Amino acid sequence: MPDQRTLLQVDGVTKVFPGVRALDNVTFSVLTGEVHGLVGENGAGKSTLMAVATGALVPEEGRVVIDGVEAVGDTEKARSLGLAIVRQEPALMPELTLAENLYLGVPEAERPSLMDLSGWAQRLLEQWSHGVAIDTGTRVLSLNPEERFIVEIVKALAAKPKVLVLDEPTEHLLAEDVERLFERIRRITASGCGVVYISHRIREVQKIANRLTVLRDGQGQGTYQAAGLSEHQIVELIVGRAMDREFPAKSADAASDIIFEVESLSGTGFSNVSLKLRKGEIVGLAGIDGNGQREFMRALTGLIHSRGRAMLNGRPVSLRSSRLCAQAGIVFLPGDRHSEGIFAGLSVRENFSIRSLGLDSMHGLVSRPSEARRTQLAIREYAVKTPSIETDVASLSGGNQQKLALASVLANKPKVILIDEPTQGVDVGARGEIYEVLREAARHGTAIIVVSSDAEEVAGLSDRVMIFSRGHIVKELHGDSVVESNITTAILTATAHRERGFDRVGRFWKWAAGDWAPILILAVIIFVLGLYASHVNESYLSARNLSGVLALVATLAIVSYGQQVLMLAGGIDLSVGPLMGLVVVILSFYLTDGAPVADQATGWTIVVVAAFAVGVLNWILVDPLGLHPMVATLATFMGLKAISLILRPMPGGLISESLTDGISTTVGFIPLAVIVATVAAVILEFVLYKAKLGLALRGVGSRREAARMAGIMPRRMLFTAHVSCSLLAAAAAIPLMAQVGTGDANTGENYTLAGIAAAVIGGASLFGGRGSFVGALLGALLLTQINVVTTFLNLDDAWQSVLLGAMILAAVTVYSTSRQKVVAG
């Protein structure tokens, strides 16, 4: 169109990593109203180019202009100028709800009031599809991959971008959602938005793109009109050579022996499935996601409990565990390469040998030369491109990671290979190599079962295809009928009667994984324990006893709030106990009877400054310097204890009695301190779930990098969390001071672990992103109650430790198990 203007211009960009020139003088542009396809093999530089465009990476040379404004190396500026990106791996925070992720994912100007968050999110989802059945209050961790990707797309569209980058947007989408995506792309481009469409699926690019740019080895290979190139020409531009055939010739013998057989196999997501597999045969499992084919495959490798009969080489084989299956010769290569297929952080050598260590070991000791020799042979045989066998596997391209994983699986010469999405996220050149590896394994007698969402891939690879619907095999294709059109037709015919997914989690576990479960569970336990104690000893419910219990609760509750703040951000602080002791020691010099007001003010000022300084020190050690939180705060623990002992080698310095009496004031039998602690818990709980600060804090703890992409500053949030933790610990020392009445360097030490325990029992996650201040308050009440109840029941001190340990173990078990059960694949 003559009035088109340039929305995104990347000029002469060069980006160099150690030993690699990822981008070499690349130029790329996106016009108003166009879809610009970006294609190339894995490692060609597509993701690096988009990282430069979005400001996530700073190039050595070149510039980025968004809607006429230069923006290099600034993600926030790129977002504010109207650039949004949908990444191949959704940048979502798993512990936050769907609605909260949408809220943080859009610019400030597009955000609603937090009070209308759920309704706003529901309206956005309905713009995607009126029939969408995703609860906006659902935590992202419990969404399946397709639902997570829909949320990521909806989030990007809600930002009303001028330029939308889509990176492999259809990998996890059902067919109907792919069509919805294309319809939305057409709609936003009609209104002037420019779209960058990155995909390995060349037919999709041809279908949706106006222009396309090809990258190869970090260099542009030209920009073309999409309609002017055939699929074959695009492939040749991508790989730099002619591609005669994508799929190797099929060679299965229909008369070969049956090697693997299952009869009437049933499990979660599938039922009464029977299948026979011959030597050297590749069988494809096809169907819309959620119809049981993946669950069936995982059951065959022992990852999902199943019922039925399985035979390998005519003998019964147990499918109870993946270990037993592997020992029998049944191996599995999962589709989620990053989570289950490779061991990120380990080398190429370790990733290859880890599945076949028996070939390199004797008497439990691994022979490094043997391991290295086998790895070198494997990377040559399977054409794995890697600088060395000691390279971190995470740095390899997706295709090379997949080839290495395949080589690792084949090293033990398995009888049956189960492979889920063999080429997902793999470039077109590596696909052909992977297909050849699978077919070559079949020629040597290995039986293979493949699950793929790509009907063309299933048709090209498979000798037979089983169509799944509603957890059953509803049709079998073999011989000349194994073609893409027949597979697609069979799938679409079957889906008219299919059920979308299966409910795998019981009601109790769903409830236990919620935010209110810890609070209700603790309330019931506290009530029952109190009822029992009062039945055994009537004086338990006396005003004097209850007042004493609640006074102790206030101190523990406030320090547990500090731990809770930090744990929400993914941290922990072992120094809070000695800090409380130091506060009491400092105040014992300034808050004595008859001390001038100026001296008292000086004491309070020193305490605030000291607590702030401790928080800053812990933050510096943990964040900028990168020490583990437990190591860093343990060092602070010892330093604070040393300072307290230097100041007060022996207990001394009586705190003003009038001051301690004031702090110990009660309303009826309820101490003022516990009233303050309760009000503080309610306020902090409100901030946690209804204020931007709480949302940002949980976001950082849930997934730091995703939070950063959403515009949150993780370093700033961690600074806030560390300082808040120390200040709350100092505040907790005030009621503690009233209880001990003198400066003692050992005061407060027990509150380090007790504060953590109260937060954990109250529902905090040790991994960050989740917690409750009301839960921490009840956790503090329960821990204090246990200590008191054992005394009233005439139990010795050992029972205190037993009961406390049992409570912590039970809480962690219930919360962790429930949260794991609701996590979707």
At which residue positions do the language-model features occur?
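Glycine-rich phosphate-binding loops of nucleotide-dependent enzymes
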Residues: P2-D503, W511
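Single transmembrane alpha-helix segments in multi-pass membrane proteins
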Residues: V35, F527-V536, Y540-G594, I620-L627, ...
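Cytosolic-side transmembrane-helix boundaries in multi-pass membrane proteins
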Residues: K413, S485-N486, T493-L531, I683, ...
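Transmembrane alpha-helical segments in multi-pass inner-membrane proteins
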Residues: S453, G615, A729, Q739-G805
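Small-residue faces within membrane-embedded alpha-helices
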Residues: I526, G530, V553-L556, S560, ...
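Alpha-helical transmembrane segments within multi-pass membrane transporters and channels
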Residues: A595-F637, L778-G779
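Helix-loop-helix "hairpin" substructures at the membrane interface of multi-pass membrane proteins
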Residues: D599-V607, A613-N618, F669-G743
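Transmembrane helix-bundle core of multi-pass membrane transporters
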Residues: L625, P629-K692, M717-T720, Q739-G748, ...
